[in-house]
Amino acid sequence: MALLTISIDTDFEEFWRYNLVVMASIKRDGEQVELLKYKSEIAPVGAELSAKPSNYPEDRGVRLKCEAGDALTLYIYVIPHTLPSDKYVRYAPPYELSVSVKRGNSNIYTHRHMINQWSGENLVVDIQTER
């Protein structure tokens, strides 16, 4: 059976201001057969950090692998714990979060989602992966 590789990345320099939670539900014949969970918590919500933590990882990209099914649903939660550095909305535009899914070596989903710096985002991505 083919493997799915789920990748989530951003080049946003202030991504340290956000916690990230990812869940992936894999279905076969309409039944959930696997649930993957990933959590990257930098600080508690409301922390209002003044600078990037010294232990912040160089590459905070997400890589998840699982066996393919018929369908994949991704739940991606980008949760701000520290407000944007600029207090004016016009100077804190949305940033890109790239999500891609490969089945074996074939790319079956690629999209750049825009993330609001003030509120973060809750993304739900449904993909037919075909076995």
Regions found by a protein language model. Give the residues of each.
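Exposed aromatic-hydrophobic patches
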Residues: 58-65, 121-130
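Short amphipathic, basic-aromatic surface patches that mediate peripheral association
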Residues: 9-12, 79-89
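Short, solvent-exposed aromatic-acidic interface loops
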Residues: 41-43, 111-123
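Mature extracytoplasmic domains of secretory-pathway proteins
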Residues: 39-85
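Short, surface-exposed binding/anchoring microloops in extracellular/periplasmic proteins
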Residues: 1-34
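Extracellular or exported targeting regions of proteins
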Residues: 70-84, 94-96, 100-103, 110-112, ...
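Surface-exposed loop/edge segments in extracytoplasmic proteins
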Residues: 28-38, 46-51, 105-112
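Short coil-to-beta strand junction motifs in C2/discoidin
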Residues: 17-22, 89-98
